[in-house]
Amino acid sequence: MESAMRAQAPPTSPGPAIDVRDLRMRYGTKDVLTGVSFAARRGEVLALLGPNGAGKTTTIEILEGFRMRSAGEVSVLGQDPARGDEAWRARLGVVLQSWRDHSRWRVRDLLGYLARFYAPYGTTDVPRPWDVDELIDVVGLTEHADLKVQKLSGGQRRRLDVAIGIVGRPELVFLDEPTAGFDPHARREFHDLVHRLADFENTTVLLTTHDLDEAEKLADRILVLDGGTIVADGTADQLARELTTQAEVRWTVGGRRHVHAVEDGDPTAFVRRLLANDPDVTELEVRRASLEDTYMTLVHRAETAGGRPSAGGEQTDRTEEVQA
């Protein structure tokens, strides 16, 4: 299946998939976004993190064209989302946290019904929609293609959500808490799917999640939104190196386990001394701060500097309904 995806991969388009400059949003007298700026290249996987009320949902809805902004410049796939037409929207995929649908739909029938919308917007470079049976195979639902939606398990149901979001072979996919309710096996398979979309289809992915381990595994870059602005932008390793000061060195000598905390964040000198002074060291490992540690440090710094909790007031109930 990966070879088929590679063969059909659309060519790289010029310019970033997302370009946001000084994005601002105000609800009444409350400023939710106070100057958000970032860009995403084609085929990049970004995770947008932040505490509840930080403005994540508002940001995503503006990028999707579902909410008007107060100020700032936004370009998504080369167009202003506020002026995006149906042809532009057909290039986007949205995987919501929940989807209300008619329980009598069968998997193949539902995807076939939705796929028809995208047919007029296919091009030579990007044929649309995705072949339904191929898509069902990609998301791991071949054995369940003729089942009614109500018969699917939670993990299978979430795979269908993903299939619904990408049936039009989008160039940009928005994922909202994509693996909520997944068991570990289903989560790993979903991660593989996201990587295949980015690597073989050159699909840009912007995901929001509260699962920091998932963000660390999936994202090429991590954005942290707090107080209405981006307070960090980089890989998990870059953020840990820049924002946390402690690393942990663990080793074994004579069957006894030892642990040492390095406060300056660079354990290289300590490890060299350790190995030079004791040749019997085994099971040596260095643990840097986790993304969770880094994230908590960032949020604490941002809220302390701002003198207030994260901006609130955004609406977060994002659902869609399909009628039979």
Task: Describe each region flagged by the PLM.
Residues 173-177:
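Catalytic Walker B motif of ABC-type/P-loop ATPase nucleotide-binding domains
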Residues 112, 116-119, 124-144:
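Conserved ABC ATPase "signature" region
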Residues 64:
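Helix-to-loop junction immediately C-terminal to a conserved catalytic motif
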Residues 188-201:
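Helical segment within the ABC ATPase nucleotide-binding domain
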Residues 238-309, 313-314, 318, 324:
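Short, charged/small-residue-rich alpha-helical element at the C-terminal edge
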Residues 233-234:
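ABC ATPase "signature
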